[in-house]
UniProtKB/Swiss-Prot annotation:
Contains catalytic and regulatory chains. One of its GO terms (biological process) is pyrimidine nucleotide biosynthetic process. This is Aspartate carbamoyltransferase regulatory chain. Belongs to the PyrI family. Zn(2+) binds at residues 102, 107, 131, 134. Its cofactor is Zn(2+). It holds the Pfam family PyrI. GO terms for cellular component: aspartate carbamoyltransferase complex. Involved in allosteric regulation of aspartate carbamoyltransferase. Keywords: Metal-binding, Pyrimidine biosynthesis, Zinc. Disulfide bonds: none annotated. The lineage of its organism: Bacteria, Bacillati, Bacillota, Clostridia, Eubacteriales. The keyword Electron transport does not apply. Binds 1 zinc ion per subunit.
Length: 146
């Protein structure tokens, strides 16, 4: 059995769907980080057969809306002095800005690059978002192709 050490201070992104941890790790550009990170894949899970986990040492600035958009079943644990100080259960954010890019060629964001890409959650069950400008529908993180 593999033993993974705890972190003293930082963030643990837990309950990532098995096999998706590397996609989130890459999306967050953690491979380029100048602080310690760890990606654990196919860890044993009580809820499911397996899960992925990402540990980030000494970093507290993380966009939870992006993580909730990528995988709404993630739990973020805030670690201080090697203890879990806070558990945050993520969910789909009600709106996302500049995470999804609208691909509708008639959308104003295709022509005017300074306009932010804004999407509102329209169906939580299906994970569908609608562009605020052209009403194009996107299905959750699949729009990011991760």
């Amino acid at each position: 059995m593999l033993t993974i050490n705890s972190i003293k201070n930082g963030i643990v992104i837990d309950h990532i769907k098995a096999g998706h941890g590397i996609k989130i790790y890459n999306y967050l550009k953690l491979g380029e980080a100048e602080f310690p990170t760890a990606l654990i894949m196919n860890a044993i899970s009580k809820k499911n057969k397996a899960k992925d986990i990402i540990k980030i040492e000494n970093v507290m600035d993380l966009d939870l809306a992006v993580l909730g958009f990528l995988d709404p079943n993630i739990t973020v644990n805030i670690i201080e002095d090697e203890k879990i100080r806070q558990k945050i259960q993520l969910k789909l954010p009600s709106e996302v800005n500049n995470i999804i890019k609208c691909s509708n060629p008639r959308c104003v964001t295709s022509v005017e690059s300074y306009i932010p890409h804004k999407f509102k959650l329209v169906d939580e069950e299906k994970g569908e978002y609608k562009c605020e400008y052209c009403d194009e529908i996107y299905k959750g993180a699949k729009a990011l192709e991760i």
